[in-house]
Structures are given as C-alpha cells and as structure tokens.
Regions:
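Bacterial N-terminal signal peptides
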Residues: 10-18
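Boundary of Sec targeting at the N-terminus
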Residues: 21-25
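Short, non-transmembrane amphipathic alpha-helical segments
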Residues: 66-88
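Bacterial N-terminal signal peptides that target proteins for export
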Residues: 1-9
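Polar/charged, Gly/Pro-rich intrinsically disordered segments
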Residues: 26-62, 87-146
Length: 146
C-alpha cells in the first residue's frame, strides 16, 4: 500500500512538471520561430525564463543591434500573446522582458546593450499597434550599455 502511494505521488508530480515544461517549450519555440523568420539564429540557452521575467541574449553585427533589439522584443511579445490566446492554465506569461545584445567593438571586444520593457508594450510592438521608432524611443529610456 505504501509503495502505491509513492507511485501515485511520483506520477502526479511528473504530470504537473510536464505541463509546466510544455508551456516553457511552446514559449521558447515561438520566440525561436519568430527570430528565424528574421534570419536571426536563436538557441534555447539564449532564453532564460524566470517567474515574472524573460531574458533574451543575442549577438549582433556591428551596425544592426537595433534590429536585434526589435526582433527580440517582438518575438517575446508574440510568444506572450500566443500563450494568452491559448488560454491554458499553465501558460507562461512574464510581466517583464529583458533583451541584451552583444555588439562587437573590436576584435574580441563587445559592448552589451541591455533594455527592459513590460510585456504589454512588447505585445503592442508585435501586433503592430506600436511603431518601431516609438518603441525604440521608449526603451532607450531604460537602455544600459555594459
């Protein structure tokens, strides 16, 4: 009888963990697919999913870090909108999005541009309700250069 309880608890915990992992997988897949459509390679290890924030790390070319910033925020916005649209109880919906872009300065040296925005702002960018120039002006207020 005791082993049956343990087996039941094990299966219950696996079921709960797998539903959370599938929400994470769907979120990461959506971000990767959007980045891929803009010819930006994205790996799962470049996404860090926290409880109420998602961090995206990217490496750009020398002169196009703005495009990487925009695509990073827009892809996260689309993934959040998709999670909301599915309406699942285990949906991953972070409140904050952080994007950091490494930009080469010289051989072997990088500047890191880091910006943060609320998920509603990123969804507005992804939906086209917010113009990209307006969005860049908004995130420039929080941008840090490391």
């Amino acid at each position: 009888m005791r082993s049956n309880k343990r087996i039941f608890i094990l299966f219950l915990s696996l079921a709960l963990c797998s539903s959370f992992l599938s929400a994470n997988y769907a979120f990461k897949k959506k971000v990767k697919d959007v980045c891929k459509s803009y010819r930006i390679s994205m790996e799962s290890n470049q996404l860090e999913l926290e409880t109420d924030a998602v961090s995206i790390s990217m490496k750009s070319g020398r002169n196009n870090f703005e495009m990487f910033m925009l695509v990073g925020f827009a892809s996260a916005g689309q993934a959040i909108a998709h999670q909301k649209q599915m309406g699942l109880s285990n949906a991953y919906i972070p409140g904050t999005i952080r994007v950091s872009v490494d930009v080469p300065v010289s051989k072997g040296e990088f500047n890191t541009f880091m910006a943060t925005c609320k998920s509603d702002t990123a969804i507005s960018l992804a939906d086209g309700r917010l113009d990209s120039s307006e969005f860049m002006q908004e995130i420039m207020k929080t941008m840090e250069i490391l």
